[in-house]
Regions:
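PLP-dependent amino-acid enzyme catalytic core
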Residues: 1-136
Length: 136
């Protein structure tokens, strides 16, 4: 899948390029050129790591399925105490999605724990070897 800049729709890049670059040269965000259809009923049968891999693979088409499966398993496994994407029953058919089971007890863990793995793989996909410093 290609991603284009919000400031120049003619500027298209792969998912690896978008992740490695962050922002477009014009200062825009990279957005997917389309939004794939997914089988929601099939997704409901998966645990959170498998569901994440299934959705992400539709967008990050230059990443291998094996890498995405392993990355989501490692990311949403032990660090989330087995409760990644946990739906807590409230009452009857009402549930609350608990987003605080990550290592820092914040919703941001869902993205920020996976992103470094995606960045390292993006650099491999692009043949880039320079060091990257991530400030947290």
């Amino acid at each position: 899948m290609q991603f284009f800049s919000t400031r120049d729709q003619n500027r298209k890049v792969t998912s690896s390029e978008a992740i490695a670059q962050g922002l477009s040269n014009e200062g825009g965000l990279f957005v997917p050129e389309s939004f794939p259809q997914v089988d929601v009923k099939a997704l409901c049968q998966l645990d959170y790591p498998a569901m994440a891999a299934a959705v992400i693979k539709e967008y990050l088409t230059d990443y291998s399925q094996e890498f995405l499966t392993e990355a989501t398993r490692k990311t949403y496994g032990e660090a989330f105490g087995g409760k990644a994407g946990y739906l807590a029953p409230v009452e009857g058919d009402t549930y609350a999605l608990e987003l605080w089971h990550g290592p820092t007890c914040a919703f941001k863990d869902y993205a920020l724990q996976l992103m470094p793995k995606l960045l390292v793989e993006a650099k491999k996909n692009l043949g880039r070897t320079e060091k990257t410093l991530i400030l947290v």
